[in-house]
Amino acid sequence: ELAISGYPPRDLLLQEDFINGCLEAGGKISTPIPLLVGSPVPGKPRQRPGNGALRIDSDGAVREVTRKQLLPTYEVFDEARYFSPDSRPGIIRGLGGLDLGVTICEDAWQHSGLVPSDYQTDPIEQLAAWTGQGVELVATVNLSSSPFHATKQSSRLAVARAAAKTLDHPFFLANQVGGNDDLLFDGHSLAALPSGEVVAAPGWVEGVLVVDLDDFSAAQWITSDGADAPSFIASGEER
């Protein structure tokens, strides 16, 4: 979530050049595989910008996939001040040959019942309704900037398990690592199956969690320096 700009960008979002610069930076990402990356995206006429997800292909093409639906305005969050919400979750076709649902952070938390809200919609239920109408999704991805507190990973596990169970397919939560102003992001990205099985990455370390949808036990954690460090959390319990 907002990986290109950092979270939260606050009043920088009032500058059109800043948002355009984020999109240009996305186009400069060199990758042999397609990526989903969080970035602010330009607003529609007479609207604030969106908290978006971009598809970046190996040829450098950048396309907007979706925008965040649920904008939190409690505790450290003030997103409704800066963003306009989308009305539905995203679906991305043919990303590495896969069709995926796409949500952004809070979009998945409403379904778990763990956050105070008066939201009028539930993006996870929307995706579940679409799959019930014949939309075939291999998995759903959630791009997150989920700040750290002492029991936060336990909450994330509950969110992911609830979403995977309702959707009846794997649910992936990719969280930021590091600090931005007064917020700390602990990582602990994870993957959950409808059965409740979870594989989670370690905290406070940048890297890639590689998950085989057919065999969660074969998951690998590769650190940012390219070393294979298989100390992931197979059970998903907090450490």
What is each of the regions a protein language model found here?
Residues 1-239:
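Enzyme catalytic cores with a strong preference for nitrogen-chemistry domains
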